[in-house]
Curated annotation (Swiss-Prot):
InterPro entries: Restrct_endonuc-II-like (IPR011335), tRNA_endonuc-like_dom_sf (IPR011856), UPF0102_YraN-like (IPR003509). This is UPF0102 protein Dred_2035. GO terms for molecular function: nucleic acid binding. Belongs to the UPF0102 family. It comes from Desulforamulus reducens (strain ATCC BAA-1160 / DSM 100696 / MI-1). Gene3D superfamilies: 3.40.1350.10.
Amino acid sequence: MSIQRKALGNKGEEEACKYIQNLGYNIMERNYRCKIGELDIIAWDPVGMLVFLEVRSRSGRAFGVPEESVNYRKQNKLRMLAQQFLLTKSEFAKISCRFDVIGVYFNKEGSVQEIKHIKNAL
């Protein structure tokens, strides 16, 4: 992954965190890593549901909309990552959870142009 893509991804995650915090979410963990991969954001929504959030960022529309890049393979990986996370947290054994996708669009100047939040994306 190029340095520019990594920086764009990090900036997108920062903007997504600000966005969900403004909606009343409480961020529990960022960039949870295990041998399978990484979950971008794990948070509690305002009604107390555990939410696994995948953040996708784009600086243009040439490669499609960010949220469409979460394909079947990525969805399966996210499910496995969430299962792994929940296995390590026995206190969450009976907690309801969902998967959301946040697409962050940046304009040419690097400012946020639009944020799309898709709840129950998987």
